[in-house]
Amino acid sequence: MSRFIRYLPFFIGLGLLPVLHACVDQYDPGLTANTNLLVVEGIVTDQSSVQTISLSRSRSSRDSLTKIPIQRAAVTVLVNGSTPVRLSEVEPGIYQFPAGFKGQVGQSYQLRFRTEQGVAYESSVETMVPVPPVLRAYDTFNEQGIRTTADSRPVPTNDVYVDFQDPGAQTNFYLWRWRLYESQRWCATCEQGRYTLTDLGPVGSGPINVLGCVRDTTLGIFNLFDYPCRGLCWDIFYSTDVNVFADLNADGRLQVGRKVASIPIYQRDQALLVIEQLSLSPNAYRYYKLFADQTQNTGTLADTPPAPTVGNVRNLADPNENVVGYFSAASVAVLPYKLTRQNVTTGSYQGLFYAINRRLPNVESPRNGGSSAGVGVPSAICIPSRTRTDLLPPGW
């Protein structure tokens, strides 16, 4: 079952990925109570996009879970056992490879880092293996879809499948992930405030000065005003399920109808799904499979598994320390797939804004000339981030 629907109301408000930094798979592990675990999250790929590794510490109690970034660590990835690549911290706990870096099939990678306190860690060596291309993708309309946790009502979905040719005479391990571009018509919400911008000229075609939400104490403290987008805008969502497969009983066969996504339908607008098919090492596959079995197959990602899923990173001075997460290397086959939604035959859809906020937009009344915030009602800028873009999605 897709977790897209379960966390949708939080995606924009928390500024998430939710979770993935470019080429990094980030899966928050279920933790037992009263734990303090180091979490390593990262996949080196052969894609040209920015690649990062995340280091954090998860502290849990019976009623809370806190994720604290590990800052100012010295992070290096050793390529082929001899060439060190130094990463730089670009956000708290997020370490980025140098510009232009991308992995190569056949090369090996090992993560090494030292915390600010001088504790040294290293991963096992991961070798990047090739991955076959996705031959085609297609979707079906599922009227029953998935169910929300709030009211258990079914939300229709586009269920997406892929075909691919598995290479013969070898064992292959796969992981699928995706990112979804949904058109967004509303770009800002102001609480006890008004969205303000001014044209610097020429009006309509020149630069603008964006002040954003400016507080207005004449409004109630819980007053919300919503502002439409000034131009085209897309919200970006990422997969959170762990979807893995081993060809142990299907070596060399054409794989038909592998389900890779169930995308909830909140609007009839077209959307773009970028499908990624990744190759995994045997050890990486075992880790992700165990993680999926302990979380997805026992309820939700919030459920506590029997024990933390320990990965392939170890403390050099204390091998008994449990380090959660997995550092791996994977070749990636990418296929952009357009969800036309022409096969959506039934249902009433209230739009993406309603799905995220559980309410309809509240539009500010037009302003008069006496308002310090300007005249009329402004439209809002689509501010690019990890979960939003004003650029036409690749493959649109």
Per-region residue spans from a language model:
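A sequence/structural signal for flexible, mid-protein segments enriched
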Residues: V24-A74, L78-W396
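Bacterial N-terminal signal peptides that target proteins for export
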Residues: S2-I12
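C-terminal motif of bacterial Sec signal peptides marking the signal peptidase cleavage site
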Residues: V19-A22
